[in-house]
Amino acid sequence: MTSAVLEKTSIHPSAVIHPTAEISEGVIIGPNVVIGEGVKIGKGTRVIANAYIEYAEIGENCTISPFSTIGSEPQDLGYKGEPTKVIIGNETIIKENVTIHRGAACGDFTTRIGNKCLLMVGSHVAHNCVLEDQVILANLVTLGGHVHVGFGAFVGGMSVFHQNIRIGDMAIISGFSASRQDILPYSKGEGRPPVPRGLNVIAMKRRGISQEVRTATNEAFKLLISEEYNTTQAIEKIKAEIPMNEYIEKMIDFIQTSKRGVLLKSHKSGYQSLDEE
């Protein structure tokens, strides 16, 4: 046990806690939990039975479910024990058997998960991933290293994603999907690859985005995925014909800054699916 444990904190006698761990007020630590070196846990967080945590900073009012592992070494052959970590925001829920690996020795050496995220049973977040606020990963989702998942994105169960790709804000991806290219913000996608099937209008409406803005964004989206135009032509047409807004600007910027390419068309128009390799 550690002197950093404050009043009103509950720690089960069978828990093992490293002397340097910083446990805040109101934290509950259940049976057989192991808290290793380099851990900070914020107020009101619950760590339920049999979880394992090391080299991680966890925010306030989070829930860490049984048999989850946070902060273990990255699956990177180049990792040589450098001081890396995981940072998790406030009010995030980590369900059973989730694995979150700490960063590899590149970038900022950190795997980051935002506020109010939900990682469902068995999902895996690899080294140096970034999940922005309110991301949901359904059961058994697997993210390769350095994947960036935007604000409010939802990823369906048993989906897998190549390292270094980006999933845009408020994108929704169906279960059993797989991609090695970036996923456009605000899009609905499914399959291998998850070809865009439409704009995630419901999510935009729930976020309070006006009908006028949703309509303009949808028109821009339809041009981007149209078989009639290549991406450069579609962007030129959008700028010439559609009232610009922050969501259209974000889609265009997302495309223009992509390093792996953005999945916009079906593989009939040139995309090679995973099954065709």
Regions found by a protein language model. Name each.
Residues M1-S14, P19-T20, E25-G26, N61, ...:
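Terminal amphipathic alpha-helical/low-complexity segments used for targeting or macromolecular assembly
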Residues V5-L6, S10-V195:
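Structural signal for interior beta-strand "rungs" in well-ordered beta-sheet cores
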